[in-house]
UniProtKB/Swiss-Prot annotation:
Tree of life domain: Eukaryota
Cellular-component GO terms for this entry: membrane
SMART domains referenced in this protein's UniProt entry, alphabetically: DnaJ
This protein's record includes keyword Transmembrane: yes
Protein name in the entry: Uncharacterized J domain-containing protein PF3D7_1401100
Subcellular localization, as worded in the UniProt entry: Membrane
Topology in membrane: Single-pass membrane protein
A Pfam cross-reference name: DnaJ
Keywords, alphabetical: Membrane, Merozoite, Transmembrane, Transmembrane helix
The organism of origin for this protein: Plasmodium falciparum (isolate 3D7)
Amino acid sequence: MSNRQSIDDMNLSVKNKKSKSIFSCRPVKYVCLSVAVAAVGYANYMNNGDRNSLSCVDLNNVYSRNLSESQENHNSSFTRTNLVENENEEDDIFGVHRDESFAETVLNGQDIISYLEHQNTKIHEDNIHDDISHTLLNEGDVQNYYDVLNVNEHSDLNELKRNFHNLSLQHYPKITSDNSFELNDEFNQLSEAYQVLSYQIRKNIYDNEGVYGTKKMAIVNPLIYFNGIFTTQLMHEYIGTTEVAQFVQLFLERNIAPENIVSFLEESVSDMMKGQDYRELQLTELLKQKLDLYINDDEKWQNIIKSEINVLTKSPFSKFILEAVGWTYENVGNIYMEQTDNFDNVYHGIYVNLADERINRNYAILDENVNDFVSLLKKFYPFTETVNPYLRRAKHNLNNLQGGINNLYSSVNVVYDNLFNENINISSNEHYHLLQELLKIILNINLCDIEETIRECAYNVLKDKTVDASVHSKRAHRMNILGSLMLESSNE
């Protein structure tokens, strides 16, 4: 017989629990650290490698030529950069001019939380119109996490994902008329239930110990988890698992205790590198398959690709991700076509220069966002030994490797337990600002990661030694078309 306690026993009743922000349930510093470490982990992984200029990369020797005026006017990889003179530069919707990212341009100072509410509401309405959203919240007595997600103990991961997605869209939090924002009980509980039941170790603990066993599990803020981690998986066939999502997945899968975050960060680098290698191999093979599909029927191929792209728009950040992937595909395809189709012409490496410019801009954005993350952590998390149990425990363990001072260790645990339950008193406006900054930073880090990964995979596809030059040429042309279709969709 299961020892699982009901949610109601732990004061988590859907019907009776008073609505309040998730921050009042879990310390702000705890939530911040859970998410921030993911971004810092990705930044550390990125910095372990050299930032090579694209000028050093060639696809079997890159030949170049000058673009004709006509080609300049019609080629989006060229016109969407600041290398082209444009009197209406401020009207360029793609915003790749100077150091401004596409995401910043589209938002144009708009509240990112408001933007996400609008996008998720639209996706939910589209799903209802298309008769996709069938999942209903359990209207009976909600006794446990399984009831919250309307599943049972034997439901597979796909059912968990589907129900979590549909129910989260149904209960996505709204901004009130006075511009205040508060996460609702249903949305909170859906996220917490999913973050426990979708990871086997956590699920086993819950099945054996009930909600009590989840008390000290790290739970990422529901809004950040849904928009920044979960929904990116809807585009998995094109972008794989992002580095941020992979880190969070490792962290939750292994049910790492908060006091072990620092050591886990160091240990996870190797796993993240292996995961990234697998991601690139998988995406390279998937891209080959997509480009080779109906190789002799371009019209049928384009219709299938358009249908796939339409499905990709079901993610709240899809506009930004489609632009990142589309621009990269189009640019890499152009680099290859210029080297092979026009090898006898003089060319100044325009597409390579465009890529260099874009990559340098991405690195600048990445550095800026990592610095912003550090600033947030300093503000909301105590990085001093006197109040930080992680640093204190690490120092204690280091100084006492030769002997077991159990009483002292127990006292450290008591201090940690007290700090675990401590809340930082910050205003609702500060809560809102914190969420805004975290969402913006995670979005930008994800986009930098996606572009770098997709570029590597696209190169691999066009350097595939198992096929001949005619296949390479066909793939490059289709890659260019695929990129253009994605860019069109991102602009709708």
